[in-house]
Amino acid sequence: MLRRNRRPVCYTFRVFAAPQVRLLFVEAANSVLYAHCCLLNYGRASGIGLMPLSTPVSRRALRHSRVIDVQAYVRDDGLWDIDARITDIKSYDAMLASGPRPAGTPLHDLHLRITVDHALTIVEAAAASDSVPYPGFCDTIGPAYRALIGLNLLKNFRRDLKQRLAGIAGCTHLTELAQVLPTATVQAFAGDVWSTRDGENADLSHEKPFQLDKCHALRTDGGAVAQYYPRWVAKA
């Protein structure tokens, strides 16, 4: 497993594959229960409106949960580390080619770390595998992910990632995990790299906030920009 000996976490993001994923974690993977409960309680305590999916129309049983966890760190040397982890856990005993995998035991537990400079260019990369379906084979691919070094997270990153590490050149799941790195890194460090504020708190009063026109909600001809960034409303 990758070592984590840096300063405390700067930002943490967790993506859960299904709203009922807590059931599997309670029954079979208590080691992550605390983190999940923190997320649920944060939403309630902070007053953030939770918007769950509609109630399922039929009873159902959980089969599989995939969890993606990304943590961003500020290093003492001025660089930034992004640690990403992906786990796959089944709710039933699975018979793999390599042998049985009991319910709640990770089928995949994979780690990917990149180090980026303030231009979001990757200057170091490492991968490690704690749980894999084919021990001795899947877990030999880690060194291949040094191919990420030199790529920039905001300049054709996903295209270049596919060219270097798709198919037999990499691990399907590590390469898929790498695809979340650009947006997770932007969430962590956007204010350090670009101007994201407006009005009296603007970093650069003449520069449009970075996030505008990057998604449907912040289109400059839309209501959100009219309300929160009126200076940048697109002129008809």
Regions found by a protein language model. Name each.
Residues 3-7, 14, 22, 44:
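Basic polycationic patches enriched in arginine
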Residues 49-80, 85-90:
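Short, Gly/Pro- and small/polar-rich lid/capping loops
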Residues 2, 23-24, 33, 39-40, ...:
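Leucine-biased recognition of intrinsically disordered, low-complexity hydrophobic segments
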Residues 5, 17, 27-30, 41:
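Intrinsically disordered, low-complexity polyampholyte segments enriched for Lys and acidic residues
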Residues 64, 86-236:
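Active-site- and interface-proximal helix/loop "cap" or "latch" segments in soluble metabolic
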Residues 10, 37-38:
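Cysteine-centered motifs
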